[in-house]
Amino acid sequence: MNYQRPKGTADILPGQSERWQQVEAVARKIFAQYQYHEIRTPIFENVDVFSRSAGDTSDIVTKEMYTFKDKGDRMMALRPEGTAGVVRAYVENKLYGPEHAKPYKVYYLGPMFRYERPQSGRQRQFHQIGVEAFGSDSPVLDAETLALAKQLLEALGAKHLKFVINSLGDPATRKAFHAALVDYLTPFKDQLSEDSKVRLVKNPLRILDSKDKHDQEIVANAPSILDYLTPEAQQHFDRVKTLLQGLGIPFEVDATMVRGLDYYNHTIFEVMSDDKVFGGGYTTILAGGRYNGLVEELGGPETPGIGFAMGVERLMLLMQGELPTAQPDAYIVTIDQGADQEALQMLTAIRQQGFTGEMDYMGRKPKGQFKAANKANAKLVLTIGESERAAGTVQIKNMATGDQQAFPQADVLADFGKIYTQVMEAK
């Protein structure tokens, strides 16, 4: 039987994984500049963590979650997104306590799981990098979060970016808009998709996010939530826009944007790209917003929050250029089998001194070893044969210049760095 990876998954192979490591390293560095610290949560949670946070009418909960019963007959789900698990951890570990900094800032990275139709940049197991900040409802934090998103994407080389924002207001806003939206949609009830007929009763805002083309035609003339913002919600949104303008972050306001998760309120945003790799049109590569109320929903005290998540697979499509391959600093060639012990001791010492190195493990003849060193693009080749062992020396060749000279093995073992600098800088 030929075993294949599950549909909608990918093997991240050497040559590809280095790019992922590069993205993660850049993200970690920038997050540290903003005082975010890493959090790692389980890849599966009690299913209620997601149904209570994302909303039981959301597509994620109704159609896309991978669920299973454990041996204790508890219903579990592979995490479809990162925020809910982080909020659960925030509440369970009492990270809202007075001993913790406020706002409490964390970031995460790792795999998520949704049962979707696989396509370019969209997998059933996919990866996200995200941030969450708890404890402040200041519009300044909203603006900082968008500034962080912009800095991160630009540092990763993303281009053709468009920032789109909206406000979903506060509970009073949502209540007034809910009533207006139901009044507008009710005459179209029989024309709505089956999913949206259910949403009309349970959560009509979800209809604004419908992927059904006929639903989209109906909601095109729906009321705007921006017309129902309370004075407090309007003031918050106006302040966010002013701050973004002051930061030089261009943005568009899209009153129909609601995001796919029920926990959002006040400021929400998406960052899109129309890069040609997406086949035309704008594709979302980062999105997030405020979720004041979500901590309480999962059993914690009243705590505002804001965050975003970035899809790594989609970002990878924007980073198709070749990465420089990692060159080993040293490759050790053995002329005879008896040199294996000295070679291994020397290679171990070189690595322990912070350098990269390799040797032959395939029993190749010297000619084959030199070919392997060339293929690996080694900077230096160290050769040990019978005469070198007898003299306690090693031949070291600079592969770029072809220069070669002998050094005592003891010097390599004691201070390879000094020899490396001398050989690499020799004219």
Swiss-Prot record:
GO terms for molecular function: ATP binding; catalytic activity, acting on a protein; histidine-tRNA ligase activity; transferase activity. It is found in: Cytoplasm. Its EC number is 6.1.1.21. GO terms for cellular component: cytoplasm. It catalyses: tRNA(His) + L-histidine + ATP = L-histidyl-tRNA(His) + AMP + diphosphate + H(+). Gene3D superfamilies: Anticodon-binding domain, Bira Bifunctional Protein, Domain 2. The keyword Protein biosynthesis applies. Pfam families: HGTP_anticodon, tRNA-synt_His. Keywords: Aminoacyl-tRNA synthetase, ATP-binding, Cytoplasm, Ligase, Nucleotide-binding, Protein biosynthesis. GO terms for biological process: histidyl-tRNA aminoacylation. Belongs to the class-II aminoacyl-tRNA synthetase family. NCBIfam families: hisS. Homodimer. This is Histidine--tRNA ligase. It comes from Lacticaseibacillus paracasei (strain ATCC 334 / BCRC 17002 / CCUG 31169 / CIP 107868 / KCTC 3260 / NRRL B-441).
